[in-house]
């Protein structure tokens, strides 16, 4: 009985947090199209595939699972020549809590344009837009209700007493973003960007009422440089804010090349800190145009007791379809934000 009551309480905690904020990743730098639409197409290569999977709080029956896959490419090359970049992309995202009690599906299309500010393309100013379609469903069969408790324990076969087993809502959404980026002889790179989502404040109510989604603002920035001929250091941070939640993350990643001459393979290690919530160690491997990253959120928030101090496991994959480096509109350092 105690375990069932614990599961009931924690289910509603998770559901309230899931509806209070958008899906997000600890490896925000590995998911460009969810971070800022102005990043669309801004990389060295023909096309880019990126995917991230997140599994949070496994100790309480896996209430949070998020996955995304995205593709973007540089477009209209004959129109936007030299160092100016116009990119198009698409993204699909799936998010669920309480083993499917709340499910969210997102399908988004993005476009971004980055204009060089000097003759060498060392400084750029970009803007991006995102249009998406969102579908959300609540399945009452996945939750626990008081009518399902008996004197001898919990019986999931008993009816929930709810008039409907599922509720759902569908709506379009829009977002935009800006980005300033610069490089110095490809040895140093810096950037700062901002994105703004839920411009139209869509109505999320599943019962015919009004529950407008609060706009969300994201500010992100970073700086990286070559520590020596065989290594690089990356520093980045993020601030997200809406009417009902906020988040601050900062951290650093160290990259060590394994081959002095080609520098095609490397190992990466670092750590990030999410304010008042988690410490996030990171490890990664880069081989040619493929990169894999693994991180784990160590929970330090007020929920650490209920979650048994377990946080979120996250896996990111990225592959860039490369071409002749001499024909790239941007240097390879842009492949990491």
Task: Identify the meaning behind each predicted range.
Residues 7-14:
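Bacterial N-terminal signal peptides
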Residues 21-337:
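Subset of outer-membrane beta-barrel
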Residues 1-5:
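Positively charged n-region of N-terminal signal peptides that target proteins for export
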Residues 15-20:
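Sec/Tat signal peptide C-region and signal peptidase I cleavage site
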